[in-house]
Amino acid sequence: MAKYEILYIIRPNIEEEAKNALVARFDSILTDNGATVVESKTWEKRRLAYEIQDFREGLYHIVXVEANDDAALKEFDRLSKINADILRHMIVKIDA
């Protein structure tokens, strides 16, 4: 299984319940498409280097994932691009 790390930035003015629902939804997108979520945690609220959609801060969330193929990652990528609550995301393959 290949290991991946996903980092995404959530808009800072989101309510706690909505943030938890968003994280649960995107974790389930990964697991429903065959990936295993090893760890999913909110990192912290950080100042951005530049404005993204009129925001100067963002909530960073990091997810460690194991997957046999990239179907789950492609679906995560597709849905996170159209979600207004996710400002940016990045998927990185970890070399073991």
Swiss-Prot record:
One GO cellular component this record assigns the protein to is: ribosome
Question: One GO molecular function term?
Answer: structural constituent of ribosome
Does this entry carry the keyword RNA-binding? Answer: yes
GO:BP terms for this protein?
Answer: translation
Return any one Pfam family short name: Ribosomal_S6
Instruction: Supply the alphabetized keyword list.
Output: Ribonucleoprotein, Ribosomal protein, RNA-binding, rRNA-binding
Q: Which family does it belong to?
A: Belongs to the bacterial ribosomal protein bS6 family.
Job description of the protein:
Binds together with bS18 to 16S ribosomal RNA.
PANTHER family, sorted: MITOCHONDRIAL 28S RIBOSOMAL PROTEIN S6 (PTHR21011), SMALL RIBOSOMAL SUBUNIT PROTEIN BS6M (PTHR21011:SF1)
Q: Which NCBIfam families match?
A: S6
Protein name, entry field: Small ribosomal subunit protein bS6
Name its species. Streptococcus pneumoniae serotype 19F (strain G54)
Q: Which gene encodes it?
A: rpsF
